[in-house]
Amino acid sequence: MEKSPRYRDKAKNLLPSPSSCTTTPTRYVKDDMYETTFIRTDPSSFKQVVQLLTGIPKNPTHQPDPRFPPFHSIPPIKAVTNKKQSSSFRLSERRNSMKHYLNINPTHSGPPEILTPTILNFPALDLSPDTPLMSDPFYRPGSFSQSPSDSKPSFDDDQERSIKEKGFYLRPSPSTTPRDTEPRLLSLFPMTPIHSPAPSPHDH
């Protein structure tokens, strides 16, 4: 039935042409209240028909409300009052004027100033007194320099001679020990066994 020439002519008359859209397509309203439109057209004009039905009309019936600006519009910049402008201008003037009077000298041209308690106005703070020099207990007059006329041998000479001859250091010993005796070497381990004393009969 749909392939008969008579049906084709009838359907062709009902289809809207790309140049004019005066023909109203068939619309069906279902129970769910969603409008459905069925349109038949040939493949060559399908693209133009879709653009005519879904595109933006040349004379839109819906005009935007001028009271409500569009969503993507940029809000206008609020004008700044003259008072704020004058205050900011004065602030910039003060900053510019301060630059001319700013003077920084990181290096001192004169000699360095010595800070003392008097200059710092601290009368309670006094400089510590000099520590008196104490006699060096390790200092011996004849150890560093000895005149050739002095024939008395020094302690260092005796020590060096004893090292070469005896092989040990000579240290000053107490006055009770004779100076000429060699130091007695103590053994770390006993040479003879140490026996414990026999138990007495009173221990039982």
UniProtKB/Swiss-Prot annotation:
Q: Where is the composition biased (Low complexity)?
A: 16-26, 143-152
Renumbered residue ranges of the record's region Disordered = 1-26, 56-90, 133-204
GO cellular component term of the entry, any: nucleus
Spans through the membrane: none
Positions carrying Phosphoserine are 17, 73, 128, 147, 173, 196, 200
- List the keywords (alphabetical): Nucleus, Phosphoprotein
Q: List Phosphothreonine occurrences by residue.
A: 131, 177, 192
Chain intervals with Basic and acidic residues compositional bias = 1-12
Please tell me whether the keyword S-adenosyl-L-methionine is annotated for this protein: no
> Where does it mainly reside?
nucleus
InterPro entries hit by this protein:
VQ (IPR008889), VQ_4/11/13/19/31/33 (IPR039611)
What stretch of residues is annotated with the motif VQ?
46-55
Enumerate the subcellular locations listed in this protein's record, separating them with semicolons.
Nucleus
Q: How is it modified after translation?
A: Phosphorylated on serine and threonine residues by MPK6.
PANTHER family hit by this protein: VQ MOTIF-CONTAINING PROTEIN 11-LIKE (PTHR33402), VQ MOTIF-CONTAINING PROTEIN 13-RELATED (PTHR33402:SF16)
Q: What does this protein do?
A: May modulate WRKY transcription factor activities.
Q: What is this protein called?
A: VQ motif-containing protein 13
